Amino acid sequence: MATYHNIDRTDQMILALLVKNARMPFLEIARECGVSGAAIHQRVKRLEQAGVITGSRLLVKPQALGLNVCAFVSISLSESTKYPEVIINLKNIPEIVECHFVTGKYAILAKMYCLDNDHLMDVLLNTMQKIPYIQSTDTMISLDQPIERQVWVKDFKRSGDASKKKNSEE
């Protein structure tokens, strides 16, 4: 189970600013948060060490590279215990940018980008469906992506946190 990290209001502000612009200078973040640049540096280091921040990355618009088809592929496995082996093979397909082990009818949900529908069909038929233990695939092509954002960085609590706080105050 993932570790839940308690973060204060300043940490929330830092994260919200960095999610919007990972290149924002620490001094600018410090001005926004009303603390020193050194405090921001220390807090970011602490958030990195705690695993809250796992790095910063440059985002590339797939369409700018001619990758005009975004597809989600639901994958059924003939043997669910072979999931790790299937993932090793899926990692070798550069068109796949994201993969999730999911509940329900399918075992894996993969997100991929292709040049066009012919490219997508080629990857599905000649690469993905030839991987051992992949029983079948079901493909959905994305027509639009009206929402694209990072994780929500606000003052949110787990559902049980409010009751714990209330009980401790009594």
Over which residues does each language-model region extend?
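A compositional/biophysical signature of low hydrophobicity enriched in polar/charged and small residues
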Residues: 1-170
